[in-house]
């Protein structure tokens, strides 16, 4: 596998980073979640993702919002979804970054998400057998998530 570099250079003294590789989640859901989580404090981001998993707070979909239903409440836009699977995977990557910050000796209560992004991973190619000896492709896309946490004062 190729070495994946971080998109943003950060000072290693006051930052902690983590990466989730080849996650089997929707690319569109990951893009919308990363846009929403960027710049949040870590505790607020974890609470937000837990509310999304519990179907209490929808994630506003601003780019991939064709044929989406309206959601009640203040979400910043009319349409939104509850991407539970993507939220769970991103929550695990954030937990890993928090543990990396603890290992470095950073104050975990004063961490904010400096950078979070999703990149396209490789495609797992599979085939579904059909009638009369044919086969249809059944491909699974994967993505990579990058997280950089920064200690603020």
UniProtKB/Swiss-Prot annotation:
<keyword id="KW-0689">Ribosomal protein</keyword>
<keyword id="KW-0694">RNA-binding</keyword>
<protein>
    <recommendedName>
        <fullName>Large ribosomal subunit protein uL22</fullName>
    </recommendedName>
</protein>
<dbReference type="InterPro" id="IPR036394">
    <property type="entry name" value="Ribosomal_uL22_sf"/>
</dbReference>
<comment type="function">
    <text>This protein binds specifically to 23S rRNA. It makes multiple contacts with different domains of the 23S rRNA in the assembled 50S subunit and ribosome.</text>
</comment>
<comment type="similarity">
    <text>Belongs to the universal ribosomal protein uL22 family.</text>
</comment>
<comment type="subunit">
    <text>Part of the 50S ribosomal subunit.</text>
</comment>
<keyword id="KW-0687">Ribonucleoprotein</keyword>
<comment type="function">
    <text>The globular domain of the protein is located near the polypeptide exit tunnel on the outside of the subunit, while an extended beta-hairpin is found that lines the wall of the exit tunnel in the center of the 70S ribosome.</text>
</comment>
<dbReference type="Pfam" id="PF00237">
    <property type="entry name" value="Ribosomal_L22"/>
</dbReference>
<dbReference type="InterPro" id="IPR001063">
    <property type="entry name" value="Ribosomal_uL22"/>
</dbReference>
<dbReference type="GO" id="GO:0022625">
    <property type="term" value="C:cytosolic large ribosomal subunit"/>
</dbReference>
<dbReference type="GO" id="GO:0002181">
    <property type="term" value="P:cytoplasmic translation"/>
</dbReference>
<dbReference type="InterPro" id="IPR018260">
    <property type="entry name" value="Ribosomal_uL22_CS"/>
</dbReference>
<dbReference type="GO" id="GO:0003735">
    <property type="term" value="F:structural constituent of ribosome"/>
</dbReference>
<dbReference type="InterPro" id="IPR005721">
    <property type="entry name" value="Ribosomal_uL22_euk/arc"/>
</dbReference>
<dbReference type="GO" id="GO:0019843">
    <property type="term" value="F:rRNA binding"/>
</dbReference>
<keyword id="KW-0699">rRNA-binding</keyword>
